[in-house]
């Protein structure tokens, strides 16, 4: 039976969620439920607007699941990209860490206490969506700087949803109750040094060949023959084709588009740009096909994959943005 709006617990939960969403404005939010005992995910993925998430029936549904042992997680959603918010999981942290973040211009827009001595901070670093490789690099830097959990430092990691209890057995009191996930700080806005964080990450990932046009390929980070084998490149490329059912869906495929999809996918998985280029060079069917300047084509394809035009993201197969990790 769904809890009514007169239930004081529901009202407190709604207030907490409203504060959290106000600190992290976005069009859609991914909500994920993970069972504290079995560690399995609740069937289905839920993408809700702020209004939908704050609906009394939605809140009632989530509260019932929480009482049944499900932990609630959320992330601002941007399909196959990061929405501009980075999670820093601060295990065994105190307020001094948050103050240090502020002194360095990495002001969190939201800080949660997930249990006594355990904090999660969200840092707003971009008003536009970020490529996975860029967001992951920013997350790793913040985790290193402030002692965050490196296992949580990636572009798609979800954080706790305020207003519910932490159902982990290790966090429960002697009486068996889970601690409430509480908001310590909530204030929307970009971190003052957000631009520097993103720029640093972009420099880390920007293909070296973009810096100069006159250097020899071996000086530009071009993959050597030993960097990746023909069999490895072919296996990687064919795996992408099979998972996306390219041959069944497109006859014949536009290989330049498939190359771009493969490059974006591999970059999002953390593969260095030179190795991505090698996969395309060795694994793309009949390469170099009719390209007059094959090396320039590879340069431009990987650069476009890493830094899509500002006018909008390049479409990718749905399989690339359906996965979300804990």
What are these regions (language model features)?
Residues 155-164, 282:
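A glycine-rich phosphate-binding loop feature that marks nucleotide/adenosyl-phosphate handling sites
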Residues 1-119, 124-137, 141-144, 216-224, ...:
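Signature for HUH/AEP ssDNA processing cores
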Residues 82-84, 154-157:
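A generic structural signal for well-ordered coil/turn residues at beta-strand boundaries
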